[in-house]
Amino acid sequence: MQKLLIEGGHDLTGQVRISGAKNSAVALLPAAILADSAVTIEGLPEISDVDTLGDLLEEIGGSVSRDGQDITIHPEKMMAMPLPNGKVKKLRASYYFMGAMLGKFNKAVIGLPGGCFLGPRPIDQHIKGFEALGAEVTNEQGAIYLRANELRGARIYLDVVSVGATINIMLAAVKAKGRTTIENAAKEPEIIDVATLLTNMGAKIKGVGTDVIRIDGVPSLHGCRHTIIPDRIEAGTYAIAAAAKGKEVIIDNVIPQHLESLIAKLREMDVTIEESDEQLYIARNRPLKSVDIKTLVYPGFPTDLQQPFTSLLTQATHSGVITDTIYSARLKHIDELRRMNAVIKVEGGSVIVSGPVQLEGARVKASDLRAGASLIIAGLLADGITEITGLDHIDRGYERLTEKLSSLGANIWREEMTDIEIMQDQNM
């Protein structure tokens, strides 16, 4: 096991290139199951979630070859292999195997998925959609069993706007007989990315990016090449880091329209931001003003940037209030930030951050992916050295994070943990 060490106080300057979108990758790879021939996805991030999904595709009989950031999947010999245990439980997005395998084979067995614990994140809307399409869904010994004689198009209203349910129902519906309409659908860029792949494979999908998606089922889908979109959450994380500790930072390979809510909030804080087609220029030359944020479904402020933004607010004048309406339990980073001298209160469903304060280096633990990003930004700001454990969470979603921050001027490195440190970490 490794730990991450950061010597705070070094300004960030230079250019960083954003990787392919994690939240697209975890759906694009299972979507390849639906094709009858090879699918190549270009620009995938080199992160552990992608490795896990590649292994799962091989478990069900697929052939997966990797060439740098490009992966080619041969689905011709895939079978409806049950996946009740093992790697399927390592990440939450393995639930996309439900929709893809149901769409391809009319049956699937998938262990209840894992990933970051963020409080109650039920998959009831996914199941509602599968049942509407004609599947029988049961929960047996910690695995979801899906069976259907045939899938037929249906009108499905999502009770809550859900990215996962929207994508999963799309995957199951593209080969169903007739038309499927998803109402109150999510609008995230990653959904558009998945729909673009499916359309390139021969699917008939309209309305993606709006709250009503219409899918006319087709009998078969073919292989194709697809280039993934840039990761707006990674781009947002570096934008927040640049606002916190940057002089002049250029973020390359980004779609600024995907980050309008964050850019607006950073400008409210007096951060200088200039946009071009694929780049953001960020400079901090004035004291930060505090702001309030409320996470919302896209195009609102992303829940995945709430935790990194908390660290930024510790440097702003006066108090800022953060309310996460998507995952209210996303608060495990707060105790760790308090260890670093942050002044944070939790009242009801809101987090109140007071500043500016000088953060202090400390030993802290990342409890989930975006909590890890929050602690890294705090480490860049802190006086002294910050030690961060729980890197398995961080490596799930940030490609070459140590190298990218080092190239911007951060003093950041990894070290192997001793046996004693591992024992202490397990008791934290």
UniProtKB/Swiss-Prot annotation:
<keyword id="KW-0670">Pyruvate</keyword>
<dbReference type="InterPro" id="IPR001986">
    <property type="entry name" value="Enolpyruvate_Tfrase_dom"/>
</dbReference>
<keyword id="KW-0573">Peptidoglycan synthesis</keyword>
<comment type="function">
    <text>Cell wall formation. Adds enolpyruvyl to UDP-N-acetylglucosamine.</text>
</comment>
<feature type="active site" description="Proton donor">
    <location>
        <position position="116"/>
    </location>
</feature>
<keyword id="KW-0961">Cell wall biogenesis/degradation</keyword>
<dbReference type="InterPro" id="IPR036968">
    <property type="entry name" value="Enolpyruvate_Tfrase_sf"/>
</dbReference>
<keyword id="KW-0131">Cell cycle</keyword>
<feature type="binding site">
    <location>
        <position position="304"/>
    </location>
    <ligand>
        <name>UDP-N-acetyl-alpha-D-glucosamine</name>
    </ligand>
</feature>
<dbReference type="GO" id="GO:0051301">
    <property type="term" value="P:cell division"/>
</dbReference>
<keyword id="KW-0963">Cytoplasm</keyword>
<comment type="similarity">
    <text>Belongs to the EPSP synthase family. MurA subfamily.</text>
</comment>
<dbReference type="InterPro" id="IPR050068">
    <property type="entry name" value="MurA_subfamily"/>
</dbReference>
<dbReference type="InterPro" id="IPR013792">
    <property type="entry name" value="RNA3'P_cycl/enolpyr_Trfase_a/b"/>
</dbReference>
<dbReference type="GO" id="GO:0009252">
    <property type="term" value="P:peptidoglycan biosynthetic process"/>
</dbReference>
<feature type="binding site">
    <location>
        <position position="92"/>
    </location>
    <ligand>
        <name>UDP-N-acetyl-alpha-D-glucosamine</name>
    </ligand>
</feature>
<dbReference type="GO" id="GO:0008760">
    <property type="term" value="F:UDP-N-acetylglucosamine 1-carboxyvinyltransferase activity"/>
</dbReference>
<dbReference type="GO" id="GO:0008360">
    <property type="term" value="P:regulation of cell shape"/>
</dbReference>
<feature type="binding site">
    <location>
        <begin position="22"/>
        <end position="23"/>
    </location>
    <ligand>
        <name>phosphoenolpyruvate</name>
    </ligand>
</feature>
<feature type="binding site">
    <location>
        <position position="326"/>
    </location>
    <ligand>
        <name>UDP-N-acetyl-alpha-D-glucosamine</name>
    </ligand>
</feature>
<keyword id="KW-0132">Cell division</keyword>
<dbReference type="GO" id="GO:0071555">
    <property type="term" value="P:cell wall organization"/>
</dbReference>
<keyword id="KW-0133">Cell shape</keyword>
<feature type="modified residue" description="2-(S-cysteinyl)pyruvic acid O-phosphothioketal">
    <location>
        <position position="116"/>
    </location>
</feature>
<dbReference type="GO" id="GO:0019277">
    <property type="term" value="P:UDP-N-acetylgalactosamine biosynthetic process"/>
</dbReference>
<keyword id="KW-0808">Transferase</keyword>
<comment type="pathway">
    <text>Cell wall biogenesis; peptidoglycan biosynthesis.</text>
</comment>
<protein>
    <recommendedName>
        <fullName>UDP-N-acetylglucosamine 1-carboxyvinyltransferase 2</fullName>
        <ecNumber>2.5.1.7</ecNumber>
    </recommendedName>
</protein>
<dbReference type="InterPro" id="IPR005750">
    <property type="entry name" value="UDP_GlcNAc_COvinyl_MurA"/>
</dbReference>
<feature type="binding site">
    <location>
        <begin position="121"/>
        <end position="125"/>
    </location>
    <ligand>
        <name>UDP-N-acetyl-alpha-D-glucosamine</name>
    </ligand>
</feature>
<dbReference type="Pfam" id="PF00275">
    <property type="entry name" value="EPSP_synthase"/>
</dbReference>
<dbReference type="GO" id="GO:0005737">
    <property type="term" value="C:cytoplasm"/>
</dbReference>
